[in-house]
């Protein structure tokens, strides 16, 4: 067989070498004014909800308009955003980590025209396509996971309850009346690919029943040892069962050990865990990532279970709106939701909000590392 050279020359190992096949370098996408003043900014201000101004050492100013957007978008919607960016922003726009979109302009005339254009664009039903807001002491856009549209283990939907919640708190998205920012996040199950456990308000889908076992198909669809190994609590074990006149290899589950995580279903399609009666959500509050005033902290469960109520999830949205209203009426300025709860005490939190306290809310997690490792920049040697 003839040797076919790949073009590699051992005497010149770096010749024609491709060292980066990922996304292009980020600074290639900067608007000209951002590229000019990169690393040389003096300060920024929030002029009004959804509108920011950054001032550079050179005196240049950048006006940013933040609009709420869906996490799952149609191609036509994305093209419309690109058309707006072409018209006002030289073809530049920016997606934020909370599913917002930011348009940046360099003068007040363009800012005014951009805001008027965004406010004029509406869906057929009358709702705004590009609502301006999500800055400062208000409710920003919701970060969420996949939900029923894609994932195989969700205990609740993502896009459905997120839409319903944002409709309920939309006034706070477009205003800054709250004591401090409120971050709301949603995860469809406790595997939490969206990481909502450090949010002011976190919604987490939970299963309450162990997986159902399709014994007839288990051995045909699954690698049983893999399903057994996937269980973090050793609740899954191999077994044999007689079905009709034949004995089959299958799986047994110790219900008292199951934590309803759905890992076994990921490994074995014959172990579906979704259940219309058992699935629902919990509400967690008090988390944050910021180091301001107090250290970062995890959220705590304050509502142990709310059933799924599609398409508008009325019990969930009503409870979240109520928590925000009580927080707004009682917290100090700049005080995050968790800081307010810790200042007044969690007993007082439940008293003010009227939420029911039960043994399901008691945090029994114990890990010495969590209490001994440094968790923030707030320490002294």
From Swiss-Prot:
Q: Which residues are siroheme-binding?
A: 193
Q: Which Gene Ontology terms describe the biological processes this protein takes part in?
A: sulfate assimilation
Q: Under the GO molecular function aspect, what terms does this record hold?
A: 4 iron, 4 sulfur cluster binding; dissimilatory sulfite reductase (NADH) activity; electron transfer activity; heme binding; metal ion binding; sulfite reductase (ferredoxin) activity; sulfite reductase activity
Positions that bind [4Fe-4S] cluster 2 = 231, 258, 261, 264
Note the InterPro entries from the entry. 4Fe4S_Fe-S-bd, 4Fe4S_Fe_S_CS, DsrB, NiRdtase/SiRdtase_haem-b_fer, Nit/Sulf_reduc_fer-like_dom_sf, NO2/SO3_Rdtase_4Fe4S_dom, NO2/SO3_Rdtase_4Fe4S_prot, NO2/SO3_Rdtase_4Fe4S_sf
Q: What Pfam family does this protein match (any one)?
A: NIR_SIR
Q: What is its EC number?
A: 1.8.1.22
- Entry keyword set: 4Fe-4S, Iron, Iron-sulfur, Metal-binding, Oxidoreductase
The record's free-text note on cofactor binding: Binds 2 [4Fe-4S] clusters per subunit. Binds 1 siroheme per subunit.
Name the residues that bind [4Fe-4S] cluster 1.
Answer: 151, 188-189, 193
Domain of life from the UniProt record? Bacteria
Q: Where is the 4Fe-4S ferredoxin-type domain?
A: 249-276
Q: Which cofactor does it need?
A: [4Fe-4S] cluster; siroheme
Q: Is the keyword Transmembrane helix assigned to this protein? A: no
Q: Which reaction does it catalyse?
A: [DsrC protein]-trisulfide + NAD(+) + 3 H2O = [DsrC protein]-dithiol + sulfite + NADH + 3 H(+)
The keyword Signal appears for this protein: no
Gene Ontology CC entries for this record: sulfite reductase complex (NADPH)
Subunit structure comment from the entry: Heterohexamer of two alpha, two beta and two gamma subunits.
- Record function comment: Catalyzes the reduction of sulfite to sulfide. This is the terminal oxidation reaction in sulfate respiration, a process catalyzed by the sulfate-reducing bacteria.
Q: What is this protein called?
A: Sulfite reductase, dissimilatory-type subunit beta
**Source species:** Nitratidesulfovibrio vulgaris (strain ATCC 29579 / DSM 644 / CCUG 34227 / NCIMB 8303 / VKM B-1760 / Hildenborough) (Desulfovibrio vulgaris)
């Amino acid at each position: 067989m003839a040797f076919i050279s790949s073009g590699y020359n051992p005497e010149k190992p770096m010749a024609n070498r491709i060292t980066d096949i990922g996304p292009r370098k980020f600074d290639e996408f900067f608007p000209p004014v951002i590229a000019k003043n990169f690393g040389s900014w003096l300060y920024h201000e929030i002029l009004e909800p959804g509108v920011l101004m950054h001032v550079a050492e050179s005196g240049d100013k950048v006006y940013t308009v933040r609009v709420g957007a869906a996490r799952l978008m149609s191609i036509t919607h994305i093209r419309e955003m690109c058309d707006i960016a072409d018209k006002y922003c030289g073809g530049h726009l920016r997606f934020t980590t909370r599913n917002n979109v930011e348009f940046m302009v360099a003068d007040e005339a363009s800012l005014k025209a951009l805001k008027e254009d965004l406010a004029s664009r509406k869906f057929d039903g009358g709702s705004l396509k590009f609502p301006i807001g999500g800055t400062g002491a208000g409710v920003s856009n919701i970060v969420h996971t996949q939900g029923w549209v894609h994932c195989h283990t969700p205990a609740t939907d993502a896009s459905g309850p997120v839409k319903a919640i944002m409709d309920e708190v939309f006034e706070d998205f477009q205003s800054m009346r709250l004591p401090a920012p409120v971050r709301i996040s949603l995860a469809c199950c406790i595997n939490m690919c969206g990481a909502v456990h450090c949010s002011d308000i976190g919604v987490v889908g939970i299963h309450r029943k162990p997986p159902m076992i399709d014994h007839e198909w288990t051995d045909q669809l699954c690698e049983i040892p893999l399903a057994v190994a996937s269980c973090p609590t050793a609740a899954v074990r191999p077994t044999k069962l007689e079905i009709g006149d034949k004995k089959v290899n299958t799986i047994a589950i110790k219900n008292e050990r199951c934590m309803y995580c759905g890992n076994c279903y990921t490994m074995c399609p014959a172990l579906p865990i979704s259940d219309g009666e058992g699935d629902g959500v919990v509400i967690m509050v008090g988390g944050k990532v910021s180091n301001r005033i107090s250290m970062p902290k995890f959220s705590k469960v304050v509502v142990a279970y709310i059933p799924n109520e599609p398409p508008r999830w009325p019990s969930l949205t009503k409870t979240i709106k109520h928590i925000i209203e009580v927080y707004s009426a009682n917290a100090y300025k700049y005080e995050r939701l968790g800081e307010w709860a810790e200042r007044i005490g969690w007993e007082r939190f439940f008293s003010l909000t009227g939420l029911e306290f039960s043994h399901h809310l008691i945090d029994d997690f114990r890990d010495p590392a969590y209490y001994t490792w440094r968790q923030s920049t707030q320490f002294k040697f």
